[in-house]
Amino acid sequence: MTFRLFISLCLTLLLPLPALAWDATSHRLSAYVAWEALTPAHRNRLLQILEKHPRYEQDFLDQMPVNVMVSDEDTKGRWLLGQAAVWPDLARSFEEEDRIRYNRPDWHWIDGTWMRGDALQGNVYVGVDPLPSIHGEAQGPLEHEEDVHNVVQGIEYNAGVLENPASSPAARAVALCWLLHLVGDIHQPLHTGALVSSGLFPEGDRGGNGIPTRFGNLHSTWDGALRNQPFDDTLRRMNSALRQTSPGMIDMNVDTWLQESRQVMQEFVYTDEIKAAVLRSERRRTSLPTFALDDDYLGTMQAISEDRISHAGTRLYLALRRILNTP
């Protein structure tokens, strides 16, 4: 162990561990599920792709925790893939030049009115007629980044870049990060629509960001759904679920993933209490109250979130396996 590494380790042990937000936790969980299901050859190939990332040293190697740095190669590789899944969120805070180059805010979510095929609208309408649907383009390869406007298209575009041997090594590395991240995002219900009302939210509540709760807002509450669950125990349950699942039973249609998240939002996320309060506040012209959200709601939210992230990890595994097996 080098002197620098020894000092870093000592300092790390003296500092409190930072709490992981649900975003980082969920993206690492789904990436770890995929990692542990892939073969050693596939894992090595992913790391070879990732090493060509334009910001590999500063955003990956320099960010690796000391306890991971001194561990075995498999643990380091798994952490790197998890960091790749988190990386698109890191791009939000880059210096201006790199933020413009890498940050794509519109890729993380989708307008609730955007539909393709038999998809369900993602919006919950309270006291107002539904907005007209936007009929999205048919499934197919997207050749240009300018054609990508939402999470569905982001998944399809980045899978294509990663799969295309003509893509530059740097482009493939960045696309790997985005694919890992967006497959997680589309499984979060509040990334797929919003609550729309006539007075408070005529253009939508931005996926729950306009609904105050004792944890911040509804979106951040869902973002924090797994924050207090033991990470390793949660990962073991997800890995066990994947082992008990036949790959042929997993629906790999991105439109289906979108539909699943929207069904959760329609049926559970926005409670009758929230909808009634929106109508009452609009009638009285008052602001919304802060919603407590009872233990039953929070428990169900945690169970749903774990199931959605588990599905994301399984689907990432199958998608990466297919891409890596492509000649």
Residues covered by each model-derived region:
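Bacterial N-terminal signal peptides that target proteins for export
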Residues: 1-7
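N-terminal signal peptide c-region/cleavage motif recognized by signal peptidases
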Residues: 16-18
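N-terminal, motif-rich segments that launch catalysis or mediate targeting to/interaction with membranes
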Residues: 20-182, 189-327
